[in-house]
């Protein structure tokens, strides 16, 4: 098995990882680059693979930096399944349509600006219609349910505690008479939050692809965070 990092490796956004065997190609996430003009330009570039050759996408959650290029993937030839949790499937309908709407409006604004300057209009990265087409390929799966994505790979979604529907992905790949386990963390939540469940503890893996944006930071205890929030509220209302 080969792993190619196609986003979120030298930056925070654009999560997209290509897993390839001799017989299969799948993606873990297909997120949008965000942050400014340089990141926007990355979204316009061709994928470093042929979208038509990708069998499926296994999606960690519905934040745009993890799912936001799915309509572009479909627009450029992908016709496979998009596997995600039930809650993520529900959120995708809102998130992707909203993202398509934003791209349409930004293109309209830039085109009006270009017209005044005598330049050509621009096309949106993708549209609401592209997002609606993408939703046809979504295949919801429950947490903790083992399912096959092809004759070599099996997947389980575990609660990541990040947002509603977020998942840590366990992927088993049978290759050369061996079975290798890859774990993709997606974005991880923290412990003991009042609304979301704690992230699942994964005890064993051969390969780990892990979110590390805040990996070098010490997080305060919940009680400390609550006190800090209360102090901010009191100061704000006292102005």
Report residues per predicted region.
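Catalytic core of the metallo-beta-lactamase
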Residues: 2-6, 20-21, 141-199
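Short coil/turn connectors at secondary-structure junctions
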Residues: 22-25, 52-54, 78-79, 151-153, ...
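Pre-active-site segment of Zn-dependent metallo-hydrolases
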Residues: 9, 21-80, 84-136, 188-197, ...
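Catalytic cores of nucleotide-enabled group-transfer and carboxylate-activating enzymes in metabolic
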Residues: 2, 16-25, 46, 207, ...
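Flavin (primarily FAD) cofactor-binding/catalytic cores of flavoenzymes
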Residues: 13
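Cap/insert and terminal regions of metallo-dependent hydrolase folds
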Residues: 81, 168, 188-239
